[in-house]
Structure formats: C-alpha cells, structure tokens
Amino acid sequence: MISTKTNNKSIQLNTIEEAIEDIKNGKVIIVVDDENRENEGDFVAAAEMVTPEMINFMATHGRGLICTPLTEKRCKELELGMMVNNNTDPMETAFTVSIDLRGKGVTTGISASDRAKTVKALIDKDTKPFDLARPGHIFPLKAKEGGVLRRTGHTEAAIDFARLAGLEPAGVIVEIMNEDGTMARLPQLIDVAKKFDIKIVSIEDLVAYRMEHDSLIEKKEDFTILTRFGDFRLRAYQQTTNNQVHIALTKGVWKSDEPILTRVNSTLVNNDILGTLTNNADKKLDQMFQAINENGKGAILFINQQNQAQNLLNRLHILKENQAEGEMKAPAMTMDNKDFGIGAQILHDLNICKIELMTNTQQTKRVGMIGYGLEIVDYIKY
C-alpha cells in the first residue's frame, strides 16, 4: 500500500505493481484520476480476461457506460470510425462508433454474455470489420499512443495496465456511480474497494511508474544558438510515437528545487520558430524572451502537435463565428491536453520540477502534475 493525500487527509492506495498483478490474474481494479480532471473512478480490467460475470459486476456496481479502450492501430484494423468528426468533449474522450458482434450466439447485444463476446471479438486477430454491427452496445475508445505519458485518462490507463501485465493492449472500463446516481468520489471509491476487496490506484501514480520505466522522447540536438534575444541553449527532442520534433530553449542554470520561469508553447511549424528567433519579429515571442532575459534564467518549449490540421480547422471555425459576431480577435492556439505529457517529459529532462508558468490566458490546472514530477508554483502574465 502507498499513501496519497487529498483534501489534507491521508488515504491508502495500492501500488502500481499490485494492480498490474491483479490485472494479469483477470481481476478488476479501481483507477482514480486527478481531482482537477474528472475526479472519478473507473472499474478497469483487461479485455483479454473479460467474462460475462465481470461485465455483470461492472454494470451492477459501476452503473456507468461500459467501454473498451483500444489502440489506434486496432481501431484502424477494425475500421472503427470516430463517433463524431468534431470532438467537443472537454476531456477529448475518443469514442468510436458503438458496436456489437455479429452472430457467434450474440442476440440483442446488451446481455452480459453478449457484451463479453463482443469485447473478446475486438482483440481476436481473426475478427474483421464486417463481423461488427454498427451501432451496438459496446463503446470502443481510441487510446493515444504512449498511454498516460500522452494523456492522463482512464482510456490510456487501461491500455497501459493491460500491456504492463503482458496481455493484449485493450481494456474494459466503466465509471463508478453511487447508488443514488451521483458520481463516486475518492472516499466512496475507497469504500467500494474495501467492500469488494479490489485494488485501488491512481493515474497519477501510474504516470510516475511509467516515468521511471519509459520515455517518449529522445534528445537529438543540444547546442548554443545566437538569437535576436542573445545566446540560448537549444535542445531538440524527437517523439518516439510519431517522430514529431519539439524544441526547448533555455537560459541559465538551476537546481531541481528552484522555481523556473517557463513557457510551454504550441506551434505548427518549427522552421517558422527558427526564422523568428533569428530574423522575423514576433511580439508575443519578444515578450517571452524579454521576460526570461530580465529574470536571468528560464525555459521556453515549442511543442509540435500531432493533430495540427484539426487544430487549425477548429481555430478557423471559431474565427468564422467570431467574425460573424463582429469580433476581430483570432482564437489562440492552445496547448492540447493530450500533448502535455510530452512537454512534461521534456521539462523533466531539463531538470525543471517547479514552474513559474508564463501565460496570457486563464490559470489552467494541469492533471497528473505530481506524477510527472512537476509543480506550478505561480502563474506569470506576460
């Protein structure tokens, strides 16, 4: 058991190793997320180990929507298109179309037995797209490659636990609700874990576990660059999951327990960044570097996002609406939640643990910060 703190109270959670062992043995665990995110708990199990009894348990005592997290690769193999083209869910939960297994004894698709068969079919290498009826009663979720190191959601946690247990990277999850229909929070989830003798762990601890064992970035360049703002140290990192290249520019040296002025920036093309550093003026960039020069030390990260095209389309849609309402201001390009984990790993490599975050928007709490080994100690307007 390990201890975690919430609302100034110490609560006992299980270790990630204990949870992996239970997943390997076909048991259900409870996974809780950050209180600043959904602040909920899910029953989680490996899809490979699913049984009708497990589905019935989840439906009876979880009471939420039973879903099956799958890898991007598996969703593509089964031709599972996204439920919607424009995902406006605040947590960006990636629902595909719902499905049922055709034939194989499946009737209505909703019984515990039918749903267990459908889940099993999703990981069966012989299952073809035609074998799955659409819509149905099982809701696949497309997980981000890289797991909780990319996105700190139950979807990715389920995939990570299955993979760490040596099983097919697919899971079964369901939100846990109280008997009165309200969402179960950590105190109630602890009671559920005790009642059914189930291990309970946090995504935060899973992130920390994976940070110790895995990395999604490789440093490719490290040199001093002369910019319009003076000398800065440039490090380039390549993401192992998609080969995107991200850049960190730093000034000065620091200790790990020292709060560091930091800006994490989203960008479309790194070539434009390099041009701006040496030639072209950019007001916002000027303000960032001026702040760091005045401070004497700091870091600016430029994170290339995987969904550049969709991000641009979303911004254009917002711009169109703003123009129709007489608003001239263009929508900002915001940091994608699912890419925050990449920036966190880069900050970790830069020996930055405490952050004075430069921002020109509202103060946004990031989930799983402790798991990443990071703490935002202040927000600095620039």
Language-model-detected regions and their locations in the chain:
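Catalytic domains of riboflavin
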Residues: 1-382
